[in-house]
Curated annotation (Swiss-Prot):
Name of the encoding gene: lgt
Recorded superkingdom: Bacteria
Family: Belongs to the Lgt family.
GO biological process: lipoprotein biosynthetic process
Transmembrane segments: 21-41, 60-80, 95-115, 124-144, 176-196, 203-223, 236-256
This protein's name: Phosphatidylglycerol--prolipoprotein diacylglyceryl transferase
Top-level EC class as recorded in UniProt: transferase
Organism: Vibrio atlanticus (strain LGP32)
Amino acid sequence: MSQGFIEFPNIDPVLIELGPISVRWYGLMYLVGFMFALWLANRRADQPDSGWTREQVSDLLFAGFLGVVLGGRIGYVLFYNFGLFIDDPLYLFKVWTGGMSFHGGLLGVITAMLWYAKKNGRTFFGVADMIAPLVPFGLGMGRMGNFMNSELWGRVTDVPWAIVFPNGGPLPRHPSQLYEMALEGIVLFFILNWFIKKPRPLGSVSGLFLAGYGTFRFLVEYVREPDAQLGLFGGFISMGQILSLPMVIIGVLMMVWAYKRGHYKDELPQQTK
């Protein structure tokens, strides 16, 4: 290889093996993301007049977690491997083969939030604005897990920080997982948690999340290797970009609608404490 490129560090994707049970770095990253979200949600619930209790945010995050797992798997199969699913419907349940989709997970979380809001007498946007700032850190941890698994790497490049991934061929590639970790995880986290400290109407936080994530993901897709089974649609746009563009549009429209509507207080159930 040409000098100046970085060889992928020798990282064993398995952290610990306990008999037949393997604890993987990828799973640990998601666990860290979930625990951080729970800690942050509890801090927000403890604030005066938050309208939330620790028990309520725990129930919400548990519902959201189920939505992420179920929606992420179903979305991956339908968006990225639909042909394989048609040939083998049981592929949907073969989770050990890997495969999760953020956009599918998002739809799963939206479904979970709709259910939670209806069950607990809350507004959907009140629930969505609560959970949106908790998500980016977990996304960042997930991208770190992708990097440690040497998967979802970027396109071939000659930038000085390019990395030769063990299962990405002999040529150096963009570490697109780290780009996504930085943008979707760190930058979006600070943007949202700065924004919620200001007076803002209901729906604006979740709208900003959709617009922010969609923008960052759309941009990174230009240096991320397209899925081998799909390639580029029309030779210029990836499935990730097709799914992210509506997020940007919907997110911007939500923010415009939220500010025009001007509702700054959520309608809370009678007893929240």
